[in-house]
A protein has these predicted regions:
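N-terminal charge/polar-biased segments
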Residues: 1-14, 262-274
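Alpha/beta enzyme core
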Residues: 2-232, 240-247
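Extended, intrinsically disordered, low-complexity segments
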Residues: 143, 236-274
Length: 274
C-alpha cells in the first residue's frame, strides 16, 4: 500500500488520525518513530527554523525542499502546509505536481489573502479571499494531481477572521463541492466549543481536521464524539526544541564542565541510530 493510500484509508477508518508536526527531516523521523500516523510539515515551524515569521516570506521552493527531505526520510505520509497555495490557480497546479512527484501525500491550502500572517498572531491580518477564488484553487489542485489518493485539504479561516459560523459552513460546503478531500476548520479560541459547533452542524461527507494549538485541553475522545477525524499537533515539537536548546545554552555558557548537563542531551548513539 502506498503512503497516499495509507493516509486515505486511515482517514476513512474509525480511529482519529494523529499527525505530528515537524520542521526538518530529523524531527519528522522522530514523529515517525513515536508512532504517529503522519507528519505535518508546518509553515510556521519551517519559517521559524529560518528565523523568519510565518508571513509568506519563504518561497514555495524553500518549503518544498524541507517537505521533500521529510518524504525521502520517512515511511509514513507527509502532509505539507502550503499556506495560500503560493499564488493563484496556476501556481497551485504547479505546486501540486511538484509535491506529488516528490512522494508527499497531501497538501493543505487556506483561504486567506496573500501574503498571509499566522492565524494565532495577536492583532494579525486575517483577511480572506472570496469563496469563488478559493474554489478555483481547489479545482486547479484536483485537476493537477495524478493520484486520487493524493489528498487536498481545504483550510477554512472564517472563524479566525470573525466572519462567523454560517460563513465557515458555507465555505466548507463549497470547498467540498469543488473536490477537496477534507476540511480543516481553524480556531484560536481557548475552548473547543466553536469547533464542536462546526462539526455538529456540518452536513458534508468529507472528514474534519483540527489543530488544537489554543484549545489544547481538548480530549481525543471528545473530538471523536463530534466525528472529527484528524488531529494535527502542528508546532509542539518546535516549541519544545526551542525551550530545551535555550535552557541548555544558558546552563552551558556558565558551566565549568558539561558533564553535569549530559543527562539533558541525547547521546551520540541516539543520533547514530536515526
Amino acid at each position: 500500500m502506498s503512503k497516499n493510500e495509507n493516509l486515505r484509508k486511515k482517514l476513512e477508518g474509525n480511529s482519529i488520525v494523529k499527525v505530528g508536526g515537524a520542521f526538518d527531516a530529523m524531527s519528522a523521523k522522530l514523529v515517525e518513530s513515536s508512532g504517529f500516523d503522519a507528519v505535518w510539515a508546518g509553515s510556521f515551524a519551517i519559517s521559524a527554523t529560518h528565523a523568519l515569521p510565518d508571513a509568506s516570506i519563504l518561497t514555495m521552493t524553500e518549503f518544498f525542499d524541507v517537505a521533500s527531505n521529510m518524504s525521502s526520510t520517512c515511511k509514513i505520509p507527509i502532509i505539507a502546509d502550503c499556506d495560500t497555495g503560493y499564488g493563484g490557480p496556476s501556481n497551485v497546479s504547479h505546486m501540486v505536481r511538484k509535491y506529488e512527484n516528490a512522494g508527499i501525500s497531501s497538501i493543505c491550502i487556506e483561504d486567506k489573502t496573500f501574503p498571509k500572517q499566522n492565524s494565532l498572531l495577536e492583532n494579525g491580518k486575517n483577511d480572506l479571499i472570496s469563496e469563488k477564488e478559493f474554489v478555483a484553487k481547489i479545482l486547479a489542485a484536483k485537476e493537477a494531481r495524478n493520484d486520487k489518493d493524493f489528498l487536498i485539504i481545504a483550510r477554512v479561516e472564517a472563524l479566525i477572521s470573525g466572519l462567523g459560523m454560517n460563513e465557515a459552513l458555507k465555505r466548507a460546503t463549497a470547498y467540498e463541492n469543488a473536490g477537496s478531500d477534507a476540511i480543516l476548520i481553524h480556531s484560536k479560541q481557548k475552548t473547543p466549543d466553536e469547533i464542536f459547533e462546526f462539526a455538529d452542524s456540518w452536513k458534508g461527507s468529507i472528514p474534519i481536521v483540527v489543530v488544537p494549538t489554543t484549545y489544547d485541553s481538548v480530549k481525543i475522545s471528545d473530538l471523536s464524539l463530534h466525528n472529527i477525524k484528524m488531529i494535527i499537533y502542528a508546532n509542539q515539537t518546535l516549541r519544545v526544541a526551542h525551550l530545551a536548546i535555550t535552557k541548555l545554552l544558558r546552563e552551558m555558557i556558565n558551566a565549568e564542565h558539561i558533564s553535569d548537563i549530559k543527562e539533558e542531551m541525547s547521546t551520540m548513539q541516539d543520533l547514530f541510530n536515526l
